[in-house]
């Protein structure tokens, strides 16, 4: 077994760290890449479009850059090849499928603690800035992700108890030295942690530079090369530490990328509670963080730091996001930290696949001057209100399947003819040539060979299906014989099939990105509009077909909603006619059979029609049963609730709710309110208006007693500096209306600083998560709202608790959210007399 853990470029050298059968290895090589140029002679190597090219070796990577520049404007002379030389090297020297063992990778969780900056009188002056490292580090924890052992490095003696090996370094300077030496001794290959990219690693590196010098700081890299890159995002400077030879994988960013769930806060505290039911150690009994560090050192501070590492370790035990990222990386042959963007990932996949076929890629267009907008998916106006006995079907991997179906790829693209989706739906679109596919927007694709992109998509789909099948077989085997060798194999296969799924789902993100080497707006839009065609032909023709099949009155509507890759049907009339009086379980099973045997069958016929109209390369559009419910409620496009009894053939003992787009599932709704709203769904579906109104009245009484942070609105506060005014705090209407939550954040910052509390409480920086509440007027700040950081409490010193308008807060959160749902069925969330008062 041989696999890389880091491949990086330093000057003209490629620097490699890898794991082999004999252990870890690292080496540096002066890499001379291969480029390709146009050729009149047969060479056995061709471009994506079939032209002959020949290999050239200009020399070093710098020489290659100069070579490309030299011939850039020479007519009739073109250069081809992968100019991301790290990716080229990985593919060249790791040509086979890569198998890896995560346990052989030196992976560590990092968490640091710092003092807050103080003036000469010991007064806290704010919070530390990682780009300046303007406060001493007092504690550093590193946890081995495999053994789960935590090592804590501190500047003073520790006499308390903690689940860590404590090293008393005596001073900050010695502590930083010991950490660097330990880092090298353990040959750290991956460093993770919560917001480690945004704070810990940046602060640690800059602090080492400040205290020990850049030579010591650069020892964090096995190549003694570290770079701090500065960029600007939304007007805010951002810094990223690049430690050559070590991959920093921020677990918070992995969670945001791969967890598939939106959270009202991405603090470690919130996510740990959500995922593990565990929290960080509370230290609210101390005056401020410096007081906590000094007085609580032995009792809580050292355990607090260690626990942060342990929580990240436990999250990875459950979620296995590090292994998932590695699996994607090795499938694509990219570095671990490249997994966050689809463009580089798919650039590598396509380049590597083509090179195996002796084909080369064109140089990437550096201009990126395409300004076309791509039309997206189809969403049908729904039937608003209750839907009885809903069934939903969804397309299998819609966008990859569309690309396969019409053989959409740069080298198969033949240009455009006059055609539209409306023409195709009416059956008056032009007839494509025998060896041509025609998309609904008029893009033509050749059929005499399969293009690289559909070929890759199809290969990934087939591989994932096989891997998933093997995984399920091993799961079944484990249930029978409990073979202890199987769980690790099952986990590896599960990660691989998840990685393949993620790669497939991310493909359109690359194809529709103007920075992608193979970007073509006509291909990208052909993919989305073919999806529209599939849904619209179902909407247009299936109702009449089902009326005949079920012997229903002409004009009966079955298709009630379509969205991107899903179609929803109302089967209430069928249930009334054929299953009246039957138990729900019997009806659910009957509808499953109807969905598979009748609806899917008829949809397959319609997809055959789509295939014929487009002269498809192969039929790949298939729809399968998703959910069967007994009732649903549609509010508007992308906003609905379905009570699901069966999902993909699996029947639930107790039905589950699928909620889309409503405040019940939005992270901008307080968690307590979301929970209450979810608890009201059975009442909405099974009782009456007055029962729902009573539920709300009872909930108000509970709401009034809650702490402020539980009733406040969660929001993201972006670009707050652009709305700030040094005189009036925030922009007036004449200067451009300041969003309410931004105004709340600016007011908090102003009054915290005004009272000299900015050393005790963190200010709200632009881009952070906040909470805000309404205030009764008049009050001590003469404003109707106030905000505070999402993971903090509203400071008592502001004197605002007595002014919090809890009734208005309830109306704006709970009542308004409920009314948005009830409007669809003509109910009122509160009694009419109360409602009149609510709306003034």
Regions found by a protein language model. Name each.
Residues 179-203:
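Proline-aspartate-enriched helix->loop->beta-strand connector
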Residues 567-596:
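Catalytic palm subdomain of template-directed nucleic-acid polymerases
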Residues 287-407, 416, 484-541, 561, ...:
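Common nucleic-acid-contacting/processivity interface regions adjacent to the catalytic cores
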Residues 150-153, 160-166, 187, 191, ...:
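Active-site-proximal helix-loop-helix substrate-binding element of RNase H-like nuclease domains
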Residues 1-187, 306-307, 311-330, 337-376, ...:
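DnaQ-like (DEDDh/DEDDy) 3′-5′ exonuclease domain used for proofreading
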Residues 280, 535-564:
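Active-site palm subdomain of RNA-directed nucleic acid polymerases
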Residues 592, 596-840:
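C-terminal, non-catalytic extensions of nucleic-acid polymerases
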Residues 238-241, 258, 363-517, 634-665:
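Catalytic nucleotidyl-transfer cores of nucleotide-processing enzymes
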């Amino acid at each position: 077994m041989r696999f890389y853990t880091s491949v990086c470029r330093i000057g003209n050298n490629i620097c490699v760290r890898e794991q082999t059968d004999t252990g870890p290895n690292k080496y540096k090589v002066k890499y001379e890449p291969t480029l390709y140029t146009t050729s009149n002679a047969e060479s056995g190597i061709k471009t994506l479009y079939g032209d002959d090219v020949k290999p050239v070796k200009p020399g070093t990577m710098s020489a290659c850059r100069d070579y490309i520049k030299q011939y850039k404007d020479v007519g009739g002379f073109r250069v081809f090849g992968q100019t991301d030389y790290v990716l080229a090297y990985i593919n060249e020297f790791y040509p086979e499928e890569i198998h890896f063992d995560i346990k052989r990778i030196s992976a560590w969780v990092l968490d640091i603690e710092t003092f807050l900056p103080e003036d000469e009188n010991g007064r806290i002056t704010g919070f530390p800035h990682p780009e300046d490292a303007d406060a001493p580090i007092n504690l550093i924890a590193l946890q081995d992700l495999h053994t789960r052992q935590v090592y804590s490095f501190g500047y003073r003696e520790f006499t308390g108890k903690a689940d860590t090996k404590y090293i008393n370094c005596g001073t900050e300077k010695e502590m930083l030295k010991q950490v660097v030496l330990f880092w090298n001794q353990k040959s750290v290959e991956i460093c993770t942690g919560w917001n480690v990219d945004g704070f810990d690693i940046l602060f640690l590196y800059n602090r080492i530079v400040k205290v020990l010098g850049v030579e010591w700081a650069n020892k964090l890299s096995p190549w003694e090369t570290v770079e701090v890159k500065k960029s600007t995002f939304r007007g805010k400077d951002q810094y990223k530490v690049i430690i050559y030879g070590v991959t920093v994988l921020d677990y918070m960013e992995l969670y945001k990328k791969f967890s598939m769930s939106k959270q009202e806060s991405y603090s470690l505290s919130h996510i740990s509670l959500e995922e593990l039911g565990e929290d960080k150690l509370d230290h609210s009994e101390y005056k401020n963080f410096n007081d906590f560090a000094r007085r609580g050192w032995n009792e809580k501070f050292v355990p607090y730091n260690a626990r942060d590492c342990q929580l990240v370790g436990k999250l990875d035990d459950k979620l296995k996001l590090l292994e998932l990222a590695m699996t994607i990386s090795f499938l694509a042959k990219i570095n671990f930290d490249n997994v966050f963007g689809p463009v580089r990932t798919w650039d590598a996949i396509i380049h590597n696949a083509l090179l195996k076929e002796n084909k080369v890629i064109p140089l990437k267009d550096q201009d990126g001057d395409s300004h076309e907008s791509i039309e997206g998916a189809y969403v049908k106006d729904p039937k608003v209100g209750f839907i009885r006995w809903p069934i939903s079907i969804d397309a299998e991997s819609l966008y990859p399947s569309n690309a396969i179906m019409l053989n959409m790829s740069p080298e198969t693209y033949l240009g455009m003819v006059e055609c539209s989706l409306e023409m195709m739906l009416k059956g008056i679109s032009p007839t494509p040539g025998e060896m041509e596919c025609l998309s609904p927007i008029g893009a033509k694709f050749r059929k005499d060979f399969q293009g690289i992109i559909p070929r890759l998509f199809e290969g990934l789909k087939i591989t994932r299906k096989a891997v998933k099948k093997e995984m399920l077989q091993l799961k079944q085997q484990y249930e029978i014989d409990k073979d202890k060798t199987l769980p690790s194999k099952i986990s590896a296969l599960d990660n691989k099939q998840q990685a393949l799924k993620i790669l497939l789902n991310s493909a359109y993100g690359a194809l529709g990105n103007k920075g992608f080497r193979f970007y073509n707006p006509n291909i990208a839009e052909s993919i989305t509009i073919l999806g529209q065609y599939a849904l619209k032909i179902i909407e247009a023709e299936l109702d009449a077909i089902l009326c005949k099949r079920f012997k229903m009155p002409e004009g009966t509507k079955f298709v009630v909603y379509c969205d991107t890759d899903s179609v929803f049907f109302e089967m209430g009339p069928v249930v009334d006619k054929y299953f009246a009086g039957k138990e729900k379980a019997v009806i659910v099973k009957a509808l499953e059979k109807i969905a598979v045997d009748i609806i899917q069958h008829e949809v397959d016929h319609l997809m055959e029609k789509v295939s014929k109209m487009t002269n498809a390369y192969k039929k790949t559009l298939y729809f399968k049963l998703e959910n069967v419910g007994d009732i649903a409620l549609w509010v508007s496009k992308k906003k609905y609730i379905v009570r699901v009894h069966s999902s993909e053939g699996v029947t639930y003992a107790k039905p589950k709710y699928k909620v889309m787009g409503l405040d019940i599932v939005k992270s901008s709704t307080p968690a307590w309110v979301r929970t209450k709203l979810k608890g009201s769904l059975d009442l909405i579906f099974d009782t009456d208006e007055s029962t729902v109104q009573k539920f709300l009245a009872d909930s108000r009484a509970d709401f009034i007693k809650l702490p402020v942070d539980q009733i406040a609105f969660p929001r993201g506060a972006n670009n707050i500096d652009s709305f700030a005014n040094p005189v009036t705090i925030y922009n007036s209407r004449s200067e451009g209306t300041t969003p309410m939550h931004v105004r709340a954040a600016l007011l908090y910052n102003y009054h915290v600083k005004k009272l000299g509390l900015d050393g005790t409480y963190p200010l709200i920086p632009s881009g952070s998560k906040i909470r805000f509440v309404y205030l009764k007027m008049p009050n001590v700040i003469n404003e109707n709202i106030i905000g505070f950081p999402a993971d903090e409490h509203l400071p008592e010193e502001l004197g605002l608790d007595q002014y919090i308008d809890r009734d208005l807060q309830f109306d704006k959160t709970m009542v308004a959210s409920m009314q948005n749902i009830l409007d669809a069925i003509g109910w009122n969330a509160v009694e009419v007399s109360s409602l009149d008062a609510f709306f003034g």
